[in-house]
Regions:
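Conserved SAM-binding loop of SAM-dependent methyltransferases across substrates and taxa
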Residues: 127-140
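Hydrophobic alpha-helical segments of small multi-pass membrane proteins
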Residues: 122-125, 129, 148-151
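Conserved class I S-adenosyl-L-methionine
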Residues: 91-93, 116-126
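Class I SAM-dependent transferase core
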Residues: 2-114, 151-152, 158-166, 274-279, ...
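S-adenosylmethionine
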Residues: 4, 137-285
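Residue-level detector of alpha-helical hydrophobic segments embedded in or interacting with membranes
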Residues: 105-106, 111, 125, 134, ...
Length: 285
């Protein structure tokens, strides 16, 4: 993580924690975030943490070395965006088409509590944050992980295989090299500690459809980056996040282009969207 997202983890009495202790801390964090996950998902989150810890020295995935710190600064940090994103990605809010192509979930099913989006692109996924975490939480959402560093992309593919995440696709390339199409029509594009906001939105221009939600995970609100946005881009919302066990600022920034402004709101009020709201909306967390 960059220096702008430096943090102090609130220390537990023991510096060395086994899987059982990590599971208890994860459960406590999920409760604080008002997230209810099935046991299988919790198990996969812990399995992913084990992979991240095991292969970190080989792939240089993160500067965080201690498993409990990884749990807080990576897993819980990524999980903190699940509820606010799910609230904005229910079927009424992303009905219709993106980039001219119908959205399809991992199994071609409509979005629900475990699939508030049909297609997500995680830009600069690194060690899989937040993309792998979202793939575990949203098993019916197609997740595209974009990571140009070959060894990190190899780790992401290994995670997808070992965690049985068949709905994950890894792109060992720069995001600018991706082209939208029927298999890549994102209704959510996001990044975490990836680049400046101007560089981020510049790279994703070709993938952004009229109703695509664009989000960036940041620590302290980057006022200089916001002021430097061009091309009709602006920050529509700044959502403060509270990550369990972490003494640090976290924010989720939602961005929009002036040309697309109001598109998502209009889709919310579309008769077809209202008709599907009760059936496909996300579960309360």
């Amino acid at each position: 993580m960059s220096s702008s997202r430096s943090a102090r983890v609130r220390r537990a009495p023991s510096a060395s924690l086994d899987r059982g202790a990590l599971e208890r801390e994860l459960a406590a964090g999920l409760a604080q975030l008002h997230l209810e996950l099935p046991e299988a998902a919790i198990g996969k989150l812990l399995d992913y943490l084990a992979l991240l810890s095991k292969w970190n020295a080989v792939y240089n995935l993160t500067a965080v070395r201690e498993p409990r710190a990884m749990l807080v600064q990576h897993l819980l940090d990524s999980l903190a965006i699940v509820a606010p994103l799910a609230a904005r990605g229910a079927a009424p809010g992303n009905g219709g088409e993106s980039n001219g192509a119908p959205r399809t979930g991992a199994e071609g099913e409509p979005p629900g509590s475990d699939a508030p989006y049909r297609c997500v692109v995680d830009v600069g996924s690194g060690g899989g944050l937040p993309g792998i975490v979202l793939a575990i939480v949203w098993p019916r959402t197609r997740i595209h992980l974009v990571e140009p560093v070959g060894k990190k992309a190899a780790f992401l593919r290994q995670c997808a295989v070992e965690l049985a995440l068949a709905h994950v696709e890894v792109h060992a390339s720069r995001v600018e090299e991706l082209q939208p199409g029927p298999a890549l029509a994102p209704d959510l594009i996001l990044c975490r500690a990836f680049a400046s906001l101007p560089d981020f939105v510049s790279g994703i221009e070709a993938l952004v459809g009229p109703s695509t939600l664009v989000a960036a995970m940041k620590g302290v609100v980057p006022r200089d980056e916001i002021a430097a946005l061009g091309g009709g881009w602006s920050v529509a919302e700044i959502l403060p996040l509270q990550v369990p066990l972490l003494d640090a600022e976290r924010h989720l920034l939602l961005l929009e282009r002036s040309a697309d402004r109001g598109t998502r709101a209009r889709s919310d009020t579309h008769p077809d969207a209202r008709a599907h709201a009760g059936r496909d909306g996300p579960a309360d967390h």
